[in-house]
Amino acid sequence: MPLPVYSSRLIEIELPTTYEIDPQRRLVTSRIWGAVTDIEIHQHNDTLRTDPKFDPTYRQLVDMTGITTIGVSTSMINETSLDQFFSPGTRRAFIATDDAVFGMARMFALRAEGLGQTIQVFRDGELAKEWLGI
């Protein structure tokens, strides 16, 4: 009977989230696209909060216009809204053009506001940038 063959080669999987930290502009720009689930949101937040360049007082711009499928549970929205790592009062703008994505973002923003978060959801990216002052 042949023995199983195992490979030590790593397989890279591109998650549908990225972020960029711009210390000069004091801005975190996050982008979320494709089919998004609890796992991707959790991993994005954990990676961002532990990035040595991250500063919780930086503003955030979240581009959600490329999301095609929402697989994020209500419990994840509740959990992440209570687990804030941006400083209270820091402006965060979410851009969502799809109605379902917009609603999910608003649900998150409303829950997070109770912890002093300042989050606005926009359908227009230029208005979001104007509100952030960028």
Task: Please place each PLM-identified region on the residue numbering.
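Amphipathic, Lys/Arg-enriched alpha-helical "gate/interface" segment within cytosolic domains
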Residues: P2-I134
